[in-house]
Curated annotation (Swiss-Prot):
ATP binds at residues 18-25. This is tRNA dimethylallyltransferase. GO terms for molecular function: ATP binding; tRNA dimethylallyltransferase activity. Its cofactor is Mg(2+). PANTHER family: TRNA DIMETHYLALLYLTRANSFERASE. Catalyzes the transfer of a dimethylallyl group onto the adenine at position 37 in tRNAs that read codons beginning with uridine, leading to the formation of N6-(dimethylallyl)adenosine (i(6)A). GO terms for biological process: tRNA modification. It comes from Pseudoalteromonas atlantica (strain T6c / ATCC BAA-1087). The record marks 109, 131 as: Interaction with substrate tRNA. Belongs to the IPP transferase family.
Length: 315
């Protein structure tokens, strides 16, 4: 009973999740017009400046209607950990709440949401891309060099892990690269869940084929809106390459490879669509196992009413 009472006393926050191309932005703007909400973006691609078309970043008109926080905060050469998102989102949520308004968190990066609702796990889950990058470095420089890198990052773990133990050495480095914190530091501290009463919603079409059609339609709009020129401009920079998190965003890698002559235009389009469908599939897999989640159909006329009713927030 005490936990329930405590929950009721926490400030409200709305989570609006969903796969890519499901209609999150349109509904979020409607919510901002009906409720005293302010949007915080929960999207690992929208954080990057100069990556507007391929990420389907909200338009200037949409941003004028409903400003989004945590958009355009980093240069594409920079990386951004889940821990950094959690820190920035909590600061934004506190600012919004202190002004008597409601944080509305909108996006499709599920690890970001989990960091808020469940707290940051003591040790992050394995990331095959980060692991592959570490193994590539090991092939080039040797595990001894990576062990020396670990000594600089986490001397306690380096003392415990032998240079000839690639599995544990790789994991310790992976944890640091994902979270920005050492294994030793994370083992000592676990951040609790964010102190908010969350109302959690997911929006998606009821039919997977409709979602795929929406993905294709949106991808073609991007191609016709200057996406190729956007990537040409990014590619012209000497400091950007395909191993960066920003350039691993769906669509960008495929366009980059097309510009390098690795495939023809139609193949680039097909690979970009396949990567986007895979992203949507992963997002939906996360959401199907999500606890206390209210589902909304993309095409329902009652989504705004249902969010207002189920979140029990009064205007």
């Amino acid at each position: 009973m005490n936990q329930h009472t405590d929950n009721q006393q926490l400030p409200p926050a709305i989570l609006l999740m969903g796969p890519t191309a499901s209609g999150k932005t349109a509904l979020a703007i409607e919510l901002c017009q009906a409720l005293p909400c302010e949007i915080i973006s929960v999207d690992s691609a929208l954080i990057y400046k100069g990556m507007d078309i391929g990420t389907a970043k909200p338009t200037a008109e949409e941003l004028a209607q409903a400003p989004h926080r945590l958009i355009d905060i980093l240069d594409p050469v920079q990386s951004y950990s889940v821990a950094e998102f959690r820190r920035d989102a909590l600061a934004a949520m506190q600012d919004i709440t202190q002004r008597g308004r409601i944080p509305l968190l909108v996006g499709g990066t599920m690890m970001y949401y989990k960091a808020l609702t469940d707290g940051l796990s003591t040790l992050p889950q394995a990331d095959p891309l980060v692991r592959a990058e570490i193994e590539k470095q090991a092939e080039k420089n040797g595990w001894q060099a990576l062990h020396q890198e670990l000594q600089g990052i986490d001397p306690v773990s380096a003392q415990r892990i032998h240079p000839n133990d690639p599995q544990r050495l790789s994991r310790a480095l992976e944890i640091y690269r994902i979270s920005g914190k050492s294994m030793t530091e994370l083992s000592l501290n676990k951040q609790p869940s964010a102190p908010y009463q969350f109302s959690q919603f997911a929006i998606a079409p009821s039919d997977r084929h409709i979602l795929h059609d929406r993905i294709a339609q949106r991808f073609d709009i991007m191609l016709n809106s200057g996406f190729e020129d956007e990537v040409i401009e990014l590619k012209s920079r000497a400091d950007l390459h395909l191993d960066l998190p920003s350039m691993r965003c769906v669509g960008y890698r495929q366009m980059w490879q097309y510009l390098d002559g690795e495939n023809i235009y139609q193949e680039m389009r097909e690979k970009g669509l396949a990567a986007t469908r895979q992203l949507a599939k992963r997002q939906l897999t996360w959401l199907r196992s999500w606890q206390n989640l209210h589902w909304l159909d993309t095409f329902s006329k009652d989504n705004l009413t249902n969010v207002m009713k189920l979140s029990r927030i009064r205007t």
